[in-house]
Amino acid sequence: MNFFQAIILGIVQALTEYLPVSSSAHIRIFGDLMLGSDPGAAFTAIIQIGTELAVILYFRHDIINILTHWFSCLFGKNGKDWKARMGRGDNYATLGWNIIVGSIPIIILGFTLQNVIETSLRNLWITVTVLLVFGILLWMVDAKARQNKTMNDMTYRDAFLFGLGQSMALIPGVSRSGGTITVGRALGYTREAAVRLSFLMAIPAVFGSGLLEAIKAVKNYKTDAMFPGWGPTLVAMVISFVLGYIVIIGFLKFVSNFSYKAFAIYRIGLAVVVALLLIVGVLPAIDPSVVAAA
């Protein structure tokens, strides 16, 4: 991978990370088209740190409030009043606990299915299937769901279901935001609430995954045939951070005025295009380097 290709992949990451269209699927597809090979799970996870840093910058006031209220309730002057220590009556502290609960599914599944995620699940036929299925689901749910829940209405049950939706993004093509937004809309959250919860809930999971992959890359960079090198990877990460911040602003304005129908149609169209490219042999379903890594 050269630096120009890294810049392109950084742009692709920034444009697709927050939208319910699957950034990992786009990185996989563009990587094959430009490089002739899959950039790999490590590259994908590390450049996602860039887009997540953009989330932290944009939502910095919310994040500071969540952390300060959470610590204040848990370790403050609430004494033996465990309901108060768990955030009763404090929306920010409660949201902090909900983010923790919502992170549990992806942590468990991410660790237990790590080898499958990095190899078998990167088959493009799987990507095509989930792009199509979750595109249809997003379209149906968004069109029919009620819109009466805000971020302050989230329960532990809802948080866990959000987490299950997020964990589906371990399969390239599902989309982390697509999974959580679909669940949120199905549970009756407004479009704005669903997308904001999706952003905040992703922070622990994406940072955790990115840091673990970075540590692995440091240890194995000489023997990992799929890792493109630190120079291109860091360039892509910086590009994804800068452009990602702009995309967040535009996406939040979009969902305040429009439905997710356009994204659902895009997913279905992309699934058809990738399927055709697979059939005619332009794209390989499984990259040879992934097979070797397995």
Swiss-Prot record:
Chief localisation class: membrane
Keyword Secreted: no
MF (Gene Ontology): undecaprenyl-diphosphatase activity
UniProt key word Chloroplast: no
EC number: 3.6.1.27
Assigned keywords, A-Z: Antibiotic resistance, Cell membrane, Cell shape, Cell wall biogenesis/degradation, Hydrolase, Membrane, Peptidoglycan synthesis, Transmembrane, Transmembrane helix
Domain of life: Bacteria
GO BP terms in the entry: cell wall organization; peptidoglycan biosynthetic process; regulation of cell shape; response to antibiotic
TM spans (from-to): 39-59, 93-113, 123-143, 198-218, 232-252, 268-288
Catalytic activity: di-trans,octa-cis-undecaprenyl diphosphate + H2O = di-trans,octa-cis-undecaprenyl phosphate + phosphate + H(+)
Location(s), subcellular: Cell membrane
Pfam families in the cross-refs: BacA
Membrane-topology descriptor: Multi-pass membrane protein
InterPro entries: UppP
Role summary: Catalyzes the dephosphorylation of undecaprenyl diphosphate (UPP). Confers resistance to bacitracin.
Miscellaneous field: Bacitracin is thought to be involved in the inhibition of peptidoglycan synthesis by sequestering undecaprenyl diphosphate, thereby reducing the pool of lipid carrier available.
Protein name per its UniProtKB record: Undecaprenyl-diphosphatase
Naturally occurring in which organism (per UniProt): Bifidobacterium longum (strain NCC 2705)
